[in-house]
């Protein structure tokens, strides 16, 4: 838990504080809403057609630190993955900007922690309402920078906004305890207090929702944040900063430092090793998560991490084929297969295998349409970059070379270098890359199995365990398998399981902690035991 000390000004607006441990000078008027200068027109000239006509206030290109929009010494380009067109040039923050953002967040924390839960709740609710009022523009930003189909982008904005709504309500439900001790003259109190400044590092596949799921909980708890968005999708984070400012979130409470891939490593290390940071929250690859854990270890920071997955999708003989296919379509091809909870391997019992594969292939051909995310009817957009396409292509070629059969798809799409055909493979075996390497693309490999025990063994062989799915009509089997799968989340006869009300997270090397739900706010709170004697 952070203790606040006086820091020399880093140029950020400071907040007053009544917290006795914080020796920052109070400001007249109390909390100071973030200022909102207009964006520089020179930075906006490069936007492609997907962003044309959007509110200039939402199309930000500078960092947002201490309530101010600040340029960096350099900029980096952000591209539309569908067309390759330049969307704009964004501030390329470095270590200096990262440290300034942490200082701004630390100074703001000393007052934000003292704001009443009711007021924090009200501000988060205003932020939520502004997201809803601007949902169409926010969705277009997501589609432009990530390639996600516009319909899915609209869904993400609602999902993202709902986290702010949820945590605006949870802010008022942070309760402590009173414990009666064996000694009659004592009472024991358990207090919950905000942990401090949180470093928040988010991925490109859900550039809005992965921010609000973390930041909503942090701000509700009384923490402040420094957000480092993915270099592919910084515009969503910056648009959220503008709306946070409009909502009256005080200066320094929400800070955003975009940076290029070249600077990402040093910026991430700077914010994660800074002694003023008390918490790290990260969503991304297991490899990067392990690096951040090393950074956290030196100063024993609190961490929560949602890392890679290898989600099994099991279809037992008793399953309803149509339901299983519908679930497979939803769990595999959302965001073109680029989610951490996408089904990565399909385990189908021998008795139902042929019927499932046939129906799955038919559903893919009938319902999946590859195209630009802005085109009506598109269900499968581009992958985020050509490196992602190469990974899918490598897995397909490896599987075919080892005996797998391509049922449909199997190659790059004619639309462009970042597009790949939705692909279904059968005759897949466990020695193939696609069964033990997270795909993050539109590839569905099917493994035939004989017994329940065999399916469980295959599913649990992975060293990660984020999500798992299975279809069965046998009640006893449902209980057995749900309890035996080594994952943090299980979908039983359901392919879409994410909800703001439910805890999201994994086991094994899929991460630490939970996000969303009533448990999410606890990731940003410390327990303090107070023994009150002499009664």
Swiss-Prot record:
The cellular component terms of Gene Ontology attached to this UniProt record, alphabetical and capped at eight, are: mitochondrion
- For the modification N6-succinyllysine, the affected residues are 126, 135, 184, 265, 402
Positions of the record's site feature: Transition state stabilizer: 205
Binding-site positions, substrate? 213, 334, 498
Q: Which cysteines are joined by disulfide bonds?
A: 340-342
Top-level division of the source organism's lineage: Eukaryota
In this chain, NAD(+) is annotated as bound at 213, 228-231, 284-289
One biological process term in Gene Ontology? succinate metabolic process
Kindly list the positions at which Phosphoserine occurs in this protein: 499
Alphabetized Gene3D superfamilies for the sequence: Aldehyde Dehydrogenase, Chain A, domain 1 (3.40.605.10), Aldehyde Dehydrogenase, Chain A, domain 2 (3.40.309.10)
Question: Can you state which reaction this protein catalyses?
Answer: succinate semialdehyde + NAD(+) + H2O = succinate + NADH + 2 H(+)
Give the pathway.
Amino-acid degradation; 4-aminobutanoate degradation
Check the record and name the Pfam families matching this protein: Aldedh
User: Sorted alphabetically, which InterPro entries does this protein's record hold?
Assistant: Ald_DH/histidinol_DH, Ald_DH_C, Ald_DH_CS_CYS, Ald_DH_CS_GLU, Ald_DH_N, Aldehyde_DH_dom, Aldehyde_DH_Superfamily, Succ_semiAld_DH
Q: Where in the cell is it found?
A: Mitochondrion
Oligomer and partners: Homotetramer.
Q: Which PANTHER family match?
A: SUCCINATE-SEMIALDEHYDE DEHYDROGENASE, MITOCHONDRIAL
In its UniProt entry, what is this protein called? Succinate-semialdehyde dehydrogenase, mitochondrial
| Native organism | Pongo pygmaeus (Bornean orangutan)
